[in-house]
Amino acid sequence: MTLRSVATVAAMLCATLASPVNAAPTGVAAIQARLTNPQGGIVVVAHRGCHAAAPQHGFTDTAPENSLAALQRCIAIGADVTETDVRRAADGTLVMLHDATVDRTTDGTGKLSELTLADLQKLRLRSDEGGAQAPLTDQRVVTLEQMLAASKGHILLNLDVKDAIYVQVVDAVTRAGMQHQVIVKAEAGIATSPLAAMQSFDRVYFFPILINAHGTADLAAIATAQARNAHPMAFELPKMAASQLPALVAVSKAHNVRLMVNSLWEGFIAGYGGDADAERNPDKVWGRMYRDGVSIIQTDAPEALLAYRATLEKH
């Protein structure tokens, strides 16, 4: 063996030793790994994006909900998922807007179904959750295509589809090559066929939203039916009594499917508390949810939830 070949072998050996054999995933791959592992810890979902201030990351002002600024803030602070709403404008363009009108979130008025993309592009988004007193920003109404492009490779999207446009939405996701970076969800009752196995829904991460009719539905039975010959990524919980949770946890464990809940407002599990309570005492609210079997939490306070998760993962 020549001196040159010895040096080459030595260099290759050093490179091999320097590279971890099973390096932990990073970026969006790490988020995918966390979501798809039911034992992967808390998944942080930012409701309508990170529109709240995030002072620990230098964001002292609010951003408009469902905006590119709110998405980019989520990426910057390390949120796992941005939840955002999809509707169809008058010309068929899919856009990110929660309400059926533009009144609350922009400086315009009118029904979205009567406005084209050209109309929408003239409007400015109001900061945070909008309203007549909310300041105007330089942010504009975002198309689904723009939202997909801005999030690709950085963060997952949880698309709350507000119109009967599921096929068009999933087709757009597929064209963007983001089937494993997008969550779609739809409501499921006791008579609903397993949604995750249906065409379109079977191409993306899918969460059935369990319908709690009159607050007394057999949610565990609905979840069991939704897992029959299908594999949803999670069951999204409705507003519910705490007494309904243990049976759902048993179903989720039996089928290796996560549970997702909103801690928005007063919280969706009666007696557990909501975001305001959690910001004062995160372990009492978010910690209790997690210990009791709920591991995907949607919040308007993603920075605080991320900080709480970090304390759990230090141990």
Where are the regions that the model predicts?
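Bacterial N-terminal signal peptides that target proteins for export
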Residues: M1-T8
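Bacterial N-terminal signal peptides
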Residues: V9-A18
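Phosphate-group recognition and catalysis centered on beta-loop-alpha active-site segments
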Residues: A23-H315
